[in-house]
A protein has these predicted regions:
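Periplasmic binding protein-like
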Residues: 38, 111, 311, 322, ...
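N-terminal lobe/hinge region of extracytoplasmic solute-binding protein
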Residues: 39-93, 101
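Aromatic- and charge-enriched surface segment that lines or borders ligand/interaction sites
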Residues: 88-150, 175-186, 190-192, 306-309, ...
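Alpha-helical secondary-structure segments
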Residues: 112-124, 177-181, 264, 344-405, ...
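Ligand-site clamp/hinge motif
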Residues: 125, 253-256, 283-329
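Surface-exposed binding/hinge segments that line
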Residues: 138-242
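Extracytoplasmic/peripheral linker and loop segments enriched in polar/acidic and small residues
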Residues: 378, 382, 390, 424-429, ...
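Structural transition elements
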Residues: 397-442, 457-462
């Protein structure tokens, strides 16, 4: 699932670390031969979740286990500093200057130090300040300017357009190479969840210049010099490898450097569409001491199949997309020691419309007439049976579930009611077929309006959502076409669909977490949406510390989103985590990504352990 609001960069940063109070770090607590198996609903496909392609929960969950970081969120959620890994401190408020220092002895699993080179790479890649070209696509969603991308600097980060881009000065390295100091051009309210270490600098540079046979030290030095000198010719191949070089669906047997880790676990096996295996990093001493030696994450998209695997003992933990049938199935196997936790999580279901693919919602289809395109978008959104989806698919699981009427704040959160009261979502509170027909007539649209609708084929709940939407929209004259795809996540932003349903998942409590999605240059802007008023409001929000003023800016943003018929939100996900208490303990679900993975160091295998 594309998350991520696993929003701009945080998949690789604030969610990728660990801590345990009162326990000595290192390998002392690893139980030899211990192993557990977890089911996840999407296959791992990239070891760099900071890229626009890799920015998915399925990847970020894995890299959370393999990455150290300066902080993480617990189950409250509360941001916790991990000072065994390193520290960060505010040196100045004007200009805002933050110093990040990695502790001595923190290393990658190949023995190279984690240091300023890694932090400089994280800055240049996720700030996108040196990017001098961007991807362009043809009608089929294929990149049409590959030669320009290859020749230029293009860090394809999900964080492009984010607040890290306000650090335009090259960060200064200090403390013998273990620290960098970031100086922001303006105050940034969410600075504490804005930066961290991603993929290894030496590995990235070694691959970018494979013919030079660079040592780790030489590779780091080459990268640092290129960044400090703004040597775009050197940075071009580095950006290319950073953007796609860590993508993988099978274990890179011929090149294990691609799975080098600086966290508690190391990827030791990966089989396409089947599983990924993680083995405890026995040299890891800069974080909490994990107990489980081997964790296998199996890829099971079908929720009922995941329940069956849990019941059969093939996996020990699952977190399937919830339906009434899933809850019933889990209750039926409770006698086997299956514990089920249900709660609302930080993911919300939404439908987005594409503005830039020459489809029915793009002004280009009407000779550039933006008003006509907006009327067609409004008409389509009026046919979305949001209440039917809620009552038929969600309330059987959670009777208290309500419609989500905000694009930026989850139901129940501070400010939600105030925003919803004025944002214009009431226009789409109920299905309005007559209103939709009237809008299409005013737009001068005749005949059926074809809408290519993207969703994941294997997701039962979304199959049901699509069926309800298709039937309702047909009454107003829309031909909603099933364009489901098992690899739907990789198609986001390609322009090959007109509408899409999926979930955004929050990784932090940042007030600007939605900026990457709705800002014109946002790394998660997947549909070509552009609105100057929205961009200006986000620019102000980034530096606004007054909560009342923050709320007014969010109101402005949402009013524009609904006035432009950007799309609609539907519901907050009902979260389900189930595990076998006879095989594992210590499972504590959390609302933010990475959800139940957040405290993996507290997991303990129960029952017999067979030592190899």
């Amino acid at each position: 699932m594309k998350i991520k609001r696993i929003f701009a960069g945080l998949a690789a940063f604030t969610v990728s670390v660990l801590v345990m109070t009162g326990c000595a770090p290192g390998s002392a607590d690893i139980v030899a031969g211990s192993s557990i198996s977890v089911a996840w609903n999407q296959a791992f496909y990239s070891n760099n979740p900071a890229t626009s392609n890799g920015n998915a929960t399925a990847n970020a969950n894995i890299t959370y286990l393999t990455s150290g970081a300066f902080n993480y969120y617990d189950a409250v959620p509360k941001l916790i500093k991990e000072e065994r890994f390193g520290k960060y401190e505010v040196l100045s408020q004007d200009p805002l200057s933050i110093k990040y220092t990695v502790n001595e002895g923190v290393k990658w699993s190949d023995g190279a130090a984690v240091d300023g080179a890694d932090m400089l790479l994280a800055w240049v890649a996720n700030s996108c300040v040196y990017n001098n070209v961007s991807a362009e696509y043809d009608a089929d969603g294929n990149i049409s300017n590959q030669a320009a991308l290859d020749a230029g600097v293009f860090f394809d980060s999900a964080s492009c357009g984010g607040d890290l881009g306000k650090v335009t000065q090259v960060p200064v390295i200090g403390d013998g190479g273990r620290s960098v100091t970031l100086v922001y051009d303006q105050p940034i309210v969410d600075w504490e969840v804005n930066f961290g270490i991603g993929v290894p600098a030496h590995v990235t540079t070694q691959h970018a210049f494979a013919g030079e046979n660079l040592s780790a030290a030489d590779a780091k030095a080459k990268l640092i010099k290129a960044i400090q000198d703004k040597d775009l010719a050197t940075l071009a191949p580095i950006s290319k490898f950073w953007s796609a070089g860590f993508d993988m669906v099978d274990f890179p047997t011929d090149d294990p450097s691609l799975v080098v880790s600086n966290g508690a676990y190391v990827i030791t096996d990966l089989v396409k569409d089947q599983y990924v295996t993680l083995t405890a990093n026995k040299n890891y001493t800069w974080g909490p001491s994990t107990k489980i030696e081997t964790i296998t994450i199996r890829f099971i998209e079908d929720p009922l199949a995941a329940v069956q695997a849990l019941s059969n003992g093939e996996v020990d933990i699952i977190s399937p997309q919830a339906t009434a049938d899933i809850i019933t199935a889990l209750n039926d196997v409770a006698s086997k020691g299956i514990v089920t936790n249900t709660t609302s999580d930080s993911t919300y279901e939404h439908i987005d419309l594409t503005f830039n693919n020459k489809g029915p919602f793009d002004p280009a289809s009407y000779g550039g007439d933006a008003d006509k395109a907006k009327m067609v978008r409004q008409a389509f959104l009026k046919t979305i049976p949001r209440k039917d989806i809620l009552t038929k698919l969600i309330q059987p699981i959670n009777p208290a579930a309500q419609l989500d009427d905000s694009q930026t704040i989850l139901p129940g959160a501070a400010g939600y009611a105030e925003v919803v009261a004025v944002n214009g979502s009431a226009e789409y509170a109920n299905v309005d077929i007559a209103g939709a027909k009237d809008l299409l007539a005013k737009a001068g649209v005749k005949g059926k309006v074809a809408v290519k609708f993207l969703f994941g084929c294997g997701n039962t709940r979304r199959q049901n959502e699509f069926a309800l939407i298709q039937a309702s929209a047909a009454e107003a004259g829309f031909d909603v076409q099933n364009k489901c795809n098992d690899d739907w996540g990789s198609l986001l932003g390609s322009g090959t669909y007109d509408a899409v349903v999926f979930g955004w998942q929050s990784t932090s409590l940042a007030v600007t977490s939605s900026k990457a999605t709705f800002a014109s240059d946002g790394g998660n802007n997947l549909n070509g949406y552009k609105n100057t008023a929205v961009d200006e409001a986000y620019a102000a929000l980034s530096s606004e510390f007054d909560t009342a003023k923050q709320l007014e800016l969010l109101k402005t943003i949402e009013k524009n989103l609904f006035a432009d018929a950007y799309g609609v939100t539907i519901f907050q996900f009902p979260g389900v985590t189930a595990y076998n208490k006879n095989k594992i303990s210590g499972i504590v679900p959390a609302p933010l990504a990475p959800m139940f993975f957040w405290n993996f160091w507290e997991w303990k295998q129960e029952g017999e352990i067979i030592k190899g």
